[in-house]
Amino acid sequence: MSLLDLNALNDLPKVERILALAETNAKLEKLDAEGRVAWALENLPGEYALSSSFGIQAAVSLHLVNTIRPDIPVILTDTGYLFPETYQFIDELADKLKLNLKVYRAEQSAAWQEARYGKLWEQGVEGIEKYNDINKVEPMNRALEELNVKTWFAGLRREQSGSRASLPVLGIQRGVFKVLPIIDWDNRTVYQYLQKHGLKYHPLWDQGYLSVGDTHTTRKWEPGMAEEETRFFGLKRECGLHEG
């Protein structure tokens, strides 16, 4: 088994790290999504995990990765402010796909946070970033550490936003390998995969939502809006999990 040296790559400056992975990424771009997952499981170190927000198209990556690697830990960072439909979707997919779901939450409850800080999501970019650090980033860091994750799969796609448009298949984030098997998929490919495997979009898709996060920072799509403008009042696209 040929494993890339994670420790050596982590010691490199970011630009050199990207260059070191460039040849591998050129090969991965030519593989299909299933091939990328299989390659990662063969060539990258474990433990392995898949993160999911259980958003609009979440069933794709959950089905894809879990089919190839049954019982892979699926990390959900639960803010306590998800839509009721999201919690129902989580239950449905966890049962249907027999997911090994690992739920992580902030150390402070949602009510305690509001008492201490107020409604952070109403406090501009700085407030949103603090909220995301508490409810998304810290729980994810804890999950990666407790589960001893060395290779992290995620369902990001370049088409989703400008901030994701140049992401490679393979990168390093938070000190671990990060693999994005469906990074180059468009909406049509997503639809075809869901249809082929009898999977559904998130329930709020039919109500006009293109992207779903917390109730207080998610808007329905309206004509003229980009998908990324439906989250965080258009102030930012990422919740912090996929930055850095």
From Swiss-Prot:
The keyword Oxidoreductase applies. Pathway: Sulfur metabolism; hydrogen sulfide biosynthesis; sulfite from sulfate: step 3/3. Its main location: cytoplasm. Its EC number is 1.8.4.8. It is found in: Cytoplasm. One of its GO terms (biological process) is sulfate assimilation, phosphoadenylyl sulfate reduction by phosphoadenylyl-sulfate reductase (thioredoxin). One of its GO terms (cellular component) is cytoplasm. InterPro entries: PAPS/APS_Rdtase, PAPS_reduct_dom, PAPS_reductase_CysH, Rossmann-like_a/b/a_fold. Transmembrane segments: none annotated. Keywords: Cytoplasm, Oxidoreductase. The keyword Cytoplasm applies. SUPFAM superfamilies: Adenine nucleotide alpha hydrolases-like. It catalyses: [thioredoxin]-disulfide + sulfite + adenosine 3',5'-bisphosphate + 2 H(+) = [thioredoxin]-dithiol + 3'-phosphoadenylyl sulfate. GO terms for molecular function: phosphoadenylyl-sulfate reductase (thioredoxin) activity. The active site is at C239. Belongs to the PAPS reductase family. CysH subfamily. This is Phosphoadenosine 5'-phosphosulfate reductase.
